[in-house]
Amino acid sequence: MMLYGESVTVLLCALFIGTQILYALASMIDIYLFRLPVDRVDMTEEQDLEPGDYPRIVLFYPVLRELEGTMRTTFLSLRHLRYPAGLFRVMSIPNSNDLETIASLRRLQQEFDFLEIMEIPATSDPSWSTVWDAWSENPKCYWWHQGSRAENRDLPPKKTRQLIYAFYTLAARERGGSDFLVNYIDADSCPPPDHLIAAAIGIRRFDVLQASNIAGNLNDTLAASWHAFDHMAWDGRKYKHLTAGGRQPFWVLGKGLFFKASDLLALGGFHPWITIEDPEVGLRFWANGKRLGYIDNPLIEEVPTTFGHGITQRKRWVAGFFQSLDVPLKALGYSWQSRVKAWMILIPCLSYWINPIGLPVGAWAMWRLVSGSGPLPTWTIILSAANVTIWVLSLCLLYRSIWQRTALVLERRRDRLRYLLRCNPVALMIWGLVWIVPLWIGWRMYRRDGGLIWERTEKVDANASLVRRITHEI
């Protein structure tokens, strides 16, 4: 009969082997993704642009109960966009019952003459018939034709609903005219001056364009530093490999992206019943043969300065990821192989779930190995050493990337070093454990069909001084 101590040892060995295999799987997926080629927008081609190469662009600005200061900072950056006059529009799209935000926008119109406002009515308004008619005629709008919410007009009150109404309303007004590009940003997103120029260059070769993002307030608090790290690792480093010459399913990032209006119309606009619209619309475009191009110059945004607000934001991301990888993949006709590729985008993030077991049993295995009483097979030690080596190398490459990207928003080297110190390897292990909270809440939201109300991330105009310094505004 096996003694209690022996039983515990067997259990710990099994847990160690299992977690190391899972870590290795996550590492192999990451290696696969990072080996994919990057399709960049080549900004040196600006000199080749002819007057007829500049498409019309409409930048939608969905807002909900935003601070006037936050919106002013964004509009300061928009005022410095370089693009031929008359070829781009900035259209704010608040809900018609958001009276305080509308009043702020009216005041800001006196300061920024390029700003237009389109108020989004309730879905009971007759003007929504433009959307219902378009969806009824388009089989690509599978959510309208299939499932428990088929022809349900009571769309959830969130950013996606605002984008849907604004896009279809504008497209109806422009019917018969030339095509245009659809661009949208968040309330705090501050594009660089060449943002629209990059679109004019890239759309000649690609169907969808996505700019990178970077947090401007990355040193405000420890929470802000860790939240900004997610963007450093994902938006700024890994995401661009999803371009991959069209071989890899992709998501979009929810701001700083460009679609052709004709493509967005043909493919059904935005899915209203998913917590965040970004992953599904990218997966839908890829399923229909559209290629993604990456814009290096990032938008500056602010990240939450408290862990509570960060968890609120990230649980919505997670719910949207799971939702997009479920019913939509089947409705879009993804093959088994394509579904696996789509899931590969998320699986490395799910490795955070391994840490509560993997870290302590890893420490136990190290102790047994050092003490000379290790019961583990040699191959498991080799696998563990390989995992640690890959982790260290990936951290070195990531820190190099972070050092380069922090120069975009931090002037002083000591501030950049301070950020690296806050994101040291031990801190990242702790952050990985914290991430389990939004992963779990987001998973529950997905299972319970939640996330249909816009839980906005609080914006506090954190980048006011940075944007004014960059744009030389007083």
Regions found by a protein language model. Name each.
Residues 1-76:
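N-proximal low-complexity "stem/linker" segments adjacent to membrane-targeting elements
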Residues 74-87, 110-111:
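Short, acidic, metal-binding catalytic loop of nucleotide-sugar glycosyltransferases
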Residues 94-108, 121-129:
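A conserved acidic beta->alpha catalytic loop
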Residues 127-176, 193-274, 311, 315-326, ...:
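Long helical/loop segments within the catalytic core of UDP-sugar-dependent glycosyltransferases
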Residues 176-190:
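Short beta-strand-to-loop acidic/aromatic patch adjacent to the donor-nucleotide binding site
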Residues 283-300:
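Catalytic donor-sugar/metal-binding loop of nucleotide-sugar-dependent glycosyltransferases
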